[in-house]
Amino acid sequence: MKRNIHIISMIMLLCTAGLSAQEVAVKTNLLADALTSPNIGVEVKLSERFSIEADFHYNPFPAGKDIRWKHWMLRPELRYWTCQPFGGHFFGMHLMYGVYNVGKVKLPFGMLKEIRSSRYEGEFMGAGLTYGYHFILSPHWSIETSVGVGFLHNRHERYRCFHCGEKTGSGNRNFIAPTRAAVSLVYVIK
């Protein structure tokens, strides 16, 4: 797992060699921030129609006395722009990998009701497709919206208690689900 993260990181570093400042944007997903998932993203122009973006989410903090919402996630994405990078419509293909420790969380729409009474530790990985639009506000500032759907594989262990280590089960799950929902504040470095 760590090896995969190192490989992705090296590829991203190699892609940034020789870049000028006009080809880089830094961003944060405001929706994820509102859901207590602090994050940062960096996007680099590769050509007249392509860019590569990677966002990293990290929350090491407990959400409350018995509530767990700790996680980290890395999601690199290759983007095709219909006009030019950092403006207008884009389509993307992304990979994702993350680790989580969640429990006693009430999710909307009755999703994953089992995490209300147990704690889950595990990892997920997947791939998906994205559609988005980049709204230019000024020469440096933009708002970007995007949604994505894809395939996820989840491995987890279930624990009865939030503080003790009594394991009550484990499992794997494969499913198609939303993989991205973003309204991002973007700063283009010029």
List each model region and its residues.
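Residues that define the transmembrane beta-barrel architecture of outer-membrane proteins
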Residues: 22, 34-36, 68-74, 87, ...
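Repeated loop/turn-to-beta-strand initiation elements of outer-membrane beta-barrel proteins
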Residues: 24, 50-52, 86, 140-143
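Solvent-exposed loop/turn segments connecting transmembrane beta-strands
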Residues: 25-40, 59-70, 85
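Membrane-embedded beta-strand positions of outer-membrane beta-barrel proteins
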Residues: 26-28, 42, 54, 76, ...
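Transmembrane beta-strands of outer-membrane beta-barrel pores
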Residues: 30-34, 56-62, 80, 95-101, ...
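Outer-membrane beta-barrel channels and translocator barrels
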Residues: 47-49, 83-87, 136-138, 190
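Flexible, solvent-exposed loop segments that connect beta-strands
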Residues: 58-71, 99-123, 155-174
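Outer-membrane beta-barrel "beta-signal"
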Residues: 81, 175-190
